[in-house]
């Protein structure tokens, strides 16, 4: 199920992203080329998948979440462009291709990331992509701004940069990853639910529990793959976190215990969906996929 669902959602979000990434003037061709390169060069599209699945959990057509799906993928892509810069993680490979600052240059990569961040909010406010009432679109903008900013993803990256060579306990490690990785994953689910225009507060609360567990599980599995996989499969440098002496779940818990923890988080996510019917099956499948994926 998950492969067909993933392919369908990837095609949908890519089609919605395409018009946003067209240069409006000849003078902006290189900037937009860097932006397109950063977004349209593959990727699992996990965050759009979660947005679409959360929308569908309420029986609402997935297309209602096109704006949400585009927005979270654009924010994710911008974060990768900036994370890969020499001043940050200094990576030269992403999704099996040279990172944006290697394919273009550092200044262009910085501007491309800035542009992608701005486009995310354009997508949420575009009535063609986000046909919801103004009050819902405002709530969606607030959700994404909170998740992407210093109280969310950006704050998590700041903590991450300050954690190199530092031995964090599990509570501190999870605080970092709930911000760096988890905040945008939680926002993806919430944005999809808001896009449905049918979610009540109790359902939003249940989905937050689901998304928080899935967000941590995603990071635990990433850390496991950094140990067990290879560069060709991952599309990025294998062992990079170990080489930089970054805190990881396998380093803290041991590999077997990290795998067990990922399974516990998956089960927590599935339990949070107990009040949802079969429309939430894609969310259930995604929770399983996130801890079973090999890249």
Language-model features: where?
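N-terminal amphipathic/basic leader segments beginning at the initiator methionine
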Residues: 1-22
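Mg2+-dependent prenyl diphosphate-binding active-site environment of isoprenoid biosynthetic enzymes
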Residues: 21, 25-271, 281-291
């Amino acid at each position: 199920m998950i492969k067909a669902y993933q392919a369908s959602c990837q095609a949908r979000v890519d089609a919605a992203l395409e018009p946003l990434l067209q240069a409006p003037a000849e003078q902006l061709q290189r900037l937009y080329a860097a932006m397109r390169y950063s977004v349209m060069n593959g990727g699992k599209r996990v965050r759009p998948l979660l947005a679409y699945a959360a929308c569908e959990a309420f029986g609402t057509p997935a297309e209602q979440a096109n704006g949400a799906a585009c927005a979270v993928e654009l924010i994710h892509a911008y974060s990768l462009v900036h994370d890969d810069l020499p001043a940050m993680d200094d990576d030269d490979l992403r999704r099996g291709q040279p990172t944006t600052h290697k394919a273009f240059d550092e200044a262009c990569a910085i501007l491309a990331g800035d542009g992608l961040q701005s486009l995310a909010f354009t997508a949420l406010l575009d009535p063609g992509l986000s046909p919801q009432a103004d009050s819902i679109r405002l709530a969606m903008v607030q959700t994404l701004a909170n998740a992407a900013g210093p109280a969310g993803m950006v704050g998590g990256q700041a903590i991450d940069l300050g954690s190199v060579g530092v031995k964090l306990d599990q509570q501190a490690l999870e605080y970092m990853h709930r911000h760096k990785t988890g905040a945008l994953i939680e926002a993806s689910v919430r944005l999809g639910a808001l896009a449905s225009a049918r979610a009540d507060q109790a359902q939003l609360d249940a989905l937050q529990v689901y998304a928080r567990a899935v967000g941590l599980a995603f990071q635990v599995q990433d850390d496991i793959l950094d140990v067990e996989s290879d560069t060709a499969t991952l599309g990025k440098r294998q062992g990079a976190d170990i080489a930089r002496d970054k805190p990881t779940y396998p380093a803290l818990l041991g590999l077997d215990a990290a795998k067990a923890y990922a399974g516990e988080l998956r089960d927590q996510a599935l339990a949070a969906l107990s009040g949802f019917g079969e429309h939430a099956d894609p969310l259930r499948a995604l929770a399983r996929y996130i801890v079973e994926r090999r890249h």
